[in-house]
Amino acid sequence: VSAGRRARGGALVCSPFTEIAMSTTYQVTDGVAVISLANPPVNGLGQSTRAGIVDGIQQANADAAVNAIVITGAGKVFCGGADIKEFGSPKASAAPDLHLTIATVEQSAKPVVAAIHGVAMGGGLELALGCHYRVVVPGTQIALPEVNIGIVPGAGGTQRLPRVLGVEAALQMITTGASVPSEKLAKAPGQKLFDRLLDGELVPGAIAYAKEIAAVRPLPSVRKLSVAAPADPEAFTKARADLAKTRKNLIAPQRCVDCVEAATKLDLDAGIAFEREVFEGLVTSDQAQALRHAFFGERAASKIPDVPDSTPTRPVTNVAVIGAGTMGGGIAMCFLNAGVPVKMLEMKQEAIDRGIGIIRKNYEAQVAKGKLAQDKYEQRMSLLSTTLSYDDIAQADMVIEAVFENFEVKAQVFTKLDAVMKPGAILASNTSTLDVDKIAEVTKRPGDVVGLHFFSPANVMRLLEVVRSKHTDKDVMATVMQVAKKIKKVAVVSGVCDGFIGNRMFEQYVRQAGFLIEEGATVQQVDKAAEAFGFAMGPFRVGDLAGNDIGYAIRQRRYVEKPDVVYSKTADAVCELGRHGQKVGKGWYDYEAGKREPVPSAEVQAAIDKVRADKGLTPRAISDDEIVQRLVLSMVNEGAHILEEGIANKASDIDMVYLTGYGFPVYRGGPMLYADMLGLPKVVALMKHFQQNPQDDARFWEPAPLLVKLAAEGKTFN
C-alpha cells in the first residue's frame, strides 16, 4: 500500500504523508478495519510504518462503514519495536514520530484493538499500550528491552506499563529488559494489560472481539488508570540498591527506576515528559553508544565479506565430539541443548564415564534450580551416545576435536579422522592457539577443516572464535556460522595466527599486568583497578581461575619461538612455587578450602620482591589510571595489528570477542570502541609516553601503523 489508499468504493483517499511508501496494509472486514504492520522481519516501526498507522486510523475514522479498528502484525510477529535499519538516521525521528503515532491511536473516536502475537517489544508494546483494547495469543513474548541498549523506553512505556501491571511487575520488566510470556502476564492478578487471551486464530478472534466492543462508550484508555504506590515504601530504594549490584556501573537501569517512580507521582502527560527528558539525556551518552555498538556488532559479526548469505551450506544433523573432558563435555552440551544428537569418543571407558557424569551433574544442577524441566533433561541425555572407536563416528556430519593442546596429539587425531570420516564431513579443531593451517594440512581434505575455539565452560560462554584457515572452503564457513547460531553462540571469524584474536590480545594484557607488579603495583591493586574499570575479574584472578600452569606452558614455548619478546618473570616465579591457581588452593592469591574468595599471599609478594631485587628495581607508586591505560591500550595496539594483518574482518569483531568471551565491560563497548571514544590521537600520545618507561617493552608500545594513520586522519577504528 503506497502513498494513497483506495477506499472500498474505489475512490482514492489521500494520505497526509503522501511522499512515503507505506509499510502497512489496510482492509475492512465486516465493519472492522484491519491495519497490518508489514515491515519484515519484525514489523519495525520505521517512518513508513508509523505513517501507515496514522493514515489507517484517520481513514477508518472517516469511513462510516467502519465501526472498530484492529492493529496487528503481518507474518510471525506483532511488532519488535524500532526499525533498526533507521537507527541514527533522520528517518528515525521524522514525522510522524512514535509519540504522535500513539497519540493518534489513543485519540481515535472508534475503538482500536491491538491483536498481538509472536513478539511485542519496545515501541511495539508501547503502541499496543496506546490502543483501547489488547488481545493476545499464548506464547507471545512481551518486553521493553531498551535498557539493554543504554536507554529507557521513549514512547510512554515507563508510564503506561505500571498502570496496567502494577509497579512491581513493571519495574522488573523495565529494569531488566527481560521478555515475559503473554499467558503469564494475562493470568497476573489485577492485570489490565490484556483484555482477552485468544485460543484460536488471532485476526478472526480480534475482529470478533472488536465487533463485541464496537459500541462501548466511553472508550477505555490506559491514560485513565491510576498507578498505585508499591506496597513497600522502600521499593524504589531497594530496587536501586539491587541494580547497583546486579547491573553494576550501568546508568540506564537506575534511570528506569526514576521513570517508574515518576509514574506514581505524576499524571500521564507529565510522566511522559519526564520520561522523554531522561531518554534524551541517555540516548547520546557514552554508555548508550557502547551498548548500541554491542547490539549491532553482534549481528554484524556473522557477516563474512566474501561469503554471501546465498552461499550453500552442508547439512549438520548430528555431530561427534572427540574428548570427554571439561571442554569436550561442554561442547557436547551445546549441541544437546539445541536438540542435535552427539556421539562422544574417548580412548578409555573410564574417561567416558567421568565425562557423562559431569554432563549429568551439570544438567541435574539446572533441574534442581528450576532452570530445566526433568523431561527436557532426559530428552537431552537421550541424544548422547558414546564410543571408543573412530569407526563409529564415520557418518557424523561434523566432528569437533577437543583433546590436549599439543600439535602432535591433534595431528594424530586429524590423520585418523581423514581416514574414517565420510566425504563432506566438517572437521573442526577446538584449538586455542595452534596453527589451523598446519592441522588442515595433515589431512587430504584441508578445505573441510576449520577451527572452532569454544571458551570454557563451553556450555555457558557465548563466544565462539571461528578460525578460518587458508584452505577452509566457503561452504564450510557458511555452515559453521549457521551452526553457531543454532547453538546460540556469538561467532566471530578469525584468521590464523598465534592465539587468534582473543588470546593474542589477552597475552599483551597479561604481559602488562606482570610489568606493573614488577614496577611497584600490588597484585590486588592491579585486579581492583581492572575490576573498577568494569572487567568481570582482574588479570590475576583470571589466571588463578584458568590455571597458572597453562600460561606457564605457553610462555616456555614462546621463549623458544620468540626469544626477542620480553616477559616479566613474576608469573614464572609464582608458578614454580606450585601455585597453579584455585584448583590447588593457591595461585596469585591464597584460597581457603572450599572457598573462592582470594586472600593476599605473603609468599607471592616475597616472590615478586625477589624478582625486583634480581633486576635491581626500586618499586614506584603506580596510579590506578596508569594501570587501566596500560592494560587496555596494550590490547588496542595489538588489535590494530590484527586488523592490519587481516586476522579480524573489522574492529567491531574484536570488540565482540572481548565483550562475549573476556569479561570486558559491555558499557564500554570493547577495547577498540573504547579507544575510539578516548580519541585515537590521545591513544597514540599515551603509547609514546609508555615507550619511555625503561622497565616496559618499548618496541611493543610503538603504535601500530594503522592506529597512527587513523589518528592522523581524524578517523576511528569503528
Predicted regions and their residues:
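Residue-identity detector for glycine
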Residues: G4, G9-G10
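Conserved CoA-thioester-binding segment of acyl-CoA-metabolizing enzymes
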Residues: G10-A74, G88-S89, L100-A103
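N-terminal glycine-rich phosphate-binding loop for ADP-containing cofactors
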Residues: A38, R50, P90, A94-L98, ...
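Glycine-rich beta-strand-to-loop/alpha-helix junction loops that act as flexible
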Residues: T72-G75, S429-T431
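Gly/Ser-rich catalytic serine loop of serine hydrolases
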Residues: G118-G124
